[in-house]
Structures are given as C-alpha cells and as structure tokens.
Amino acid sequence: LVHKRDGQIFKVKGNHKHPATLGPLCPKCAISYNGVWLDQNARLLHPLKRTGRKGTGEFKRISWDEALKEIAQRLTDIAHRDGADRIYHTHYTGTCSVIAGNFPKRFFAHLGATEVDPDTACNAAGHTALRYVFGDSVTGFDPRTATYSGCILVWGANPSHCGPHVNKHWLQQHGAKVIVIDPVRTETAAAADLHLQLRPGTDAALAFAMAHVIRRDGLVDKEYVHDHVQGYQELVPSIERCTPEWGEAATGIPPALIEQAARSYADGPSLLWLGQGLQRQPLGGNIFRACAMLPALTGNIGKPGAGFYYLNDTSGIGGRGGTAPSYEQPQADDGPAPVSQMDMPQLLQDPAAVQSYL
C-alpha cells in the first residue's frame, strides 16, 4: 500500500488483505521501499552510459529512449552476427516473482538466448527429488490453508529470520504444534514446541526412523497409500530396520523424541517445510526423497493445512486455486540448453563464447 502526501510517496506498507503475507513487508523490502528508494539522492534515476574503461567510473547520463534503443541494437547485432545463444541471461532469487522473474525469462527465451540456471549451484537437488516423488516441487501447499495445520514440521529452515510473514502467521498465531529439525538451535528452534537437534548429515536416518514409528504404531494412511503411493511395499523392509534406537545411534536424538515427533506429525493435518539448507549437503536429493516419505505415508498432502513447502512458486500455485492468477510459465524447449552457473567463470574467460552477459 502506497501512502502519498501532496502527490509524493512518503511510505510503503504491506497489504493486510494479501492472502499470503497478511500485511508485513519482509525486512529487505521495508528498508528499501521506505529508505533509499524514497531518497532520490541515494539511487539512480536515469540510465548511465560508460564512457571510459571498465573500472574507471566514467559515465554520462543518457535518456531512457537512448538506452533502450542502444541495448536493443546491440542484442540484435549479437544475435545476427554470432547467434542469440551467445547472449547469456542470469537471474536469482531477487527476481523470482511473477513479473520480475517470468517476464525477463519470456523475453530472453524469445530472443533465443542461453539461460544460466541458478539452481545448478543451489536448489536443484531439492527440486529434482520432489519432482521424482510428487511430480512437482513448488505447488505442494496452499498458504491460505495454514490456519488448518495441526502440526508444522520445519526441517532445515529458520523462518524467524528468513520468512517473517510465515513465521508470524503460521508458527506463532495459529496454534499449530511446531517441530523444528536442525543441528543449530536457531531462534525458530528455540521457540518451537519440539526441537530435534540431530547430528549434521543424518537427516535421512531420522526420516526413516520416524517412518518406522508411523508404520509400527498403525499411523499409515492405508487408503491414501493404496490410492496414491507407488513402491510402498518395496520400502517396508528398510523402514522396519530403522528403529528409533537405530535412529538414535545415527542422529543422536533419543528414541522418545523421535517417537513424539513422528506421532505429532502423523496426527495432522501437518505441513512439512523443507528448507534450502537441508539439500545443500552430500546426497541432498536423496535426503529430500527420504523426508518426502512422511506426507506420502500419512496422507498429509492435498488437503487444507497439509502438504509440503519448498520454495513455493506463486504463479504455479495460482493454477491450483492459490494466491495469484494462473500464469503460463515461459517455455524454452526449442532454444539452447541452459548452462550451469558453476560453468560461468570459465565461460566468461572466452570472449567468443559469451558476447553478452545480463
């Protein structure tokens, strides 16, 4: 919500009617909108064109028309002379919204440019694992239904610092039982009903030990498993071996706490929140697949207050009745294959390989 005085913006606040944020701005946006962006002397208002060598800080002001025309001409020249695949488009989490993220993707896909895939150095393991299990990695939970959650299991995330909206409305206000699994006693963990402070790298073992308790205590949703789960019987021998005592030897978590967490989660409706930190370790993808057993075995998916949450995509949720209108994702099936972000330092050393890096 933009507040004006005498025709000038003087304050920007969050919209309390927004179905996901319910009002607060994240700290980054709050500081930006109400700080440097309001001070015209603290930010660029016009395009600047470099007039000297890189690093000399020599620029001259040009108009928007001049800037757009020159950029368009240079991209066109590169596409005609060297091929549009020599134009590289890189992006990351600062531009992951519907407009700021997907519109540039459409533009560069239309040009035939090469996308630098940021997830290859970051979140790809988690996305790939969840797609293997559920078919999709970003539409597993409708945030508007958080009020129905009876238990929220936060695994490898610290929303008190990195997700203030959901920390306030999901973890603090709705009365759900909060379980945090994290080697570090974060602020979120300290405020939780139960903190399982496992040894680093033993997450998959803990997931299997919890699955053992769920099966042993008759908490498997047999109807859901019968209708929607493939491969359960093949997994049973492994689950049966992973007792809470075995889990304690691997993770350092006492059996009683493993059992308490498993029962609370199975009781539901439960949300499984998988943080980015969880998959940024050796075998991170398989760790995600192990954790994904829990909603599959207990039927905690596809109903209000239940599901899995990992970097949910606003536009993707929209197609399933979520917080934004449905939006067609940009497709680049006919263009050049994306390149890994990890390969860019070497590629940038070859002027013939990269003609433009945006």
Predicted regions and their residues:
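N-terminal export/assembly segments and adjacent metallocofactor-ligating motifs
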Residues: 1-219, 227, 235, 246, ...
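Generic recognition of flexible, low-complexity loop/linker segments
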Residues: 75-77, 139-143, 258-262, 305, ...
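Intrinsically disordered or highly flexible coil/loop and linker segments, enriched in small
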Residues: 80-84, 219-220, 241-248, 267-271, ...
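Conserved short loop/turn motifs at secondary-structure junctions
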Residues: 88-96, 250-253, 275-282, 314
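Non-catalytic, well-ordered alpha-helical scaffold segments
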Residues: 105, 204-208, 233, 259, ...
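Conserved, charged catalytic cores of large soluble enzymes
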Residues: 233-240
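Non-catalytic, charge-rich alpha-helical accessory subdomains
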Residues: 253-271
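A glycine-rich, hydrophobic/aromatic-adjacent loop/helix-cap motif
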Residues: 265-358
